[in-house]
């Protein structure tokens, strides 16, 4: 029963559902059964399905050995409701599956859940703000553009530290960062860090970036107690006093210093039920609805424990401060109860650890749309949280240091050297305006021809080049930029004028003829007939 590991990424809950359905349909043993004097081929009992699927889920690294038989029954109810299975008479659509001898079978085709389609042309790119970003509402026609010029000579001037080579300088203060600038830096760098850990090209399919509040991140980093628990500014969002007292009682059992009334038999069970009722009636899970896909995506990294812890750290920073505080106090209580050997059993049917996971998993992680695997996924996440809550709910120091250094760099005083590239970059900014597509095409076609034409003239007028070298360069230029060349030399004759023909030298007298002495005239006899 091999179960492929479903890694992080968008629609992980849907991918897990389809993976489990395919394995269940492909490998669930089918055989002949009798019921009420009738025989049915290729079917299975409810108990057989629970046994087989429970073992599959426990052996899967996507869910883990903490999956209970009750959770397996809940999943089979979802299977029956979604027509993954049907009873022997073909009935389906309701969650009336029970762990008994009732017969079920597979329908001819099993509907796999479709993946949501990505809206076209919608990309939520994480924007890294710069120190000179203009506030919202600035006209698009007056967007400052800083020209950047750098060459080897300027680089040498800025970086030379030899004695006597440092020119006079003066201090330049950067523009004051606003609170909105700092908040945007925290948000963009935090999301970029999370995207890098998850190994995704974009966070848009696992997280709505617009719902991320940068103020929450900053508050969760700096407004903490010595124990690392978030301190709330708004005390009305605190846990009720009676809930906090009940949690302290169980966390410090049996040393309950806050309790003045005497304890009775089963007192700890009533206290636990009080806490469970409060968390169970929250309007939204502690990890919030809009972060559900992000946390489920991180579950695909549990095989790499260190990476998963870092990813959970970042995700928990995105929580509202009141949610993060409630989660911190709850996880501390759950972990202490599980480690407390003096704590009496809080439930006769379950162990303490299993009880904690089953009781609080739904109030910690839950989807708004009731994903069919959310109970199993929540149990998996809560189990990992209990084992690593001290690290997960700490502020990630690497991220904090990186962002603080970035902000400090943008606020830092800089040294300005006369004549260096700093003089150019800090000069009065030029401005740009939006142009039409036709004007853009014209500029793209003809705007680059001016420097090329200047280059061509430089080749033509270069006296250091021989005619042979000049002809070679002109031939290369004509091949690379025929339009510019054609404009300069519209006809072959105009190009030929650059290389006028040299006058042909006069033929010289044959020297050998001059060296021979003149022969005297000799008379010859005429042969006359």
Curated annotation (Swiss-Prot):
SUPFAM superfamilies, per database record: GTPase activation domain, GAP, Winged helix' DNA-binding domain
Keywords: GTPase activation, Phosphoprotein
Rho-GAP domain ranges (all copies): 201-393
Keyword Phosphoprotein in annotation: yes
Phosphoserine carried by residues: 160, 436
Site (Arginine finger): 231
Keyword Phosphoprotein applies: yes
Domain named DEP: residues: 24-108
A single GO BP: intracellular signal transduction
CDD domains named in the record: DEP_BRCC3 (cd04447), RhoGAP_BRCC3-like (cd04405)
Pfam family, one: RhoGAP
Single GO MF annotation: GTPase activator activity
Alphabetical list of PANTHER family matching this protein: DEP DOMAIN-CONTAINING, DEP DOMAIN-CONTAINING PROTEIN 1B
Official protein name in the record: DEP domain-containing protein 1B
Organism: Homo sapiens
